[in-house]
């Protein structure tokens, strides 16, 4: 078994309040959990309304599946989130 861990740091300059940010984060996290069956949550910068940091983790049978899943998640976030990705980290444990 492998654990795939990803972190996305994104910039959303049009967001003007924490309430607006919270709606964006909740929607993205729910979509990720539903589509990919992963654990996802906002893990940092909760008090900064223009920066979104999402952590994602999943347990997969082998390394190749972890790579494939992380590629799919990355493409999904690029296509479904208006925020620009500043940084993406990946780790397989």
Model region roles, listed by residue range:
Residues 10-14, 34, 58-60:
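Beta-strand elements of well-folded, non-transmembrane domains
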Residues 21:
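C-terminal binding/interaction regions
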Residues 58-93:
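C-terminal structural segments of small proteins and small subunits
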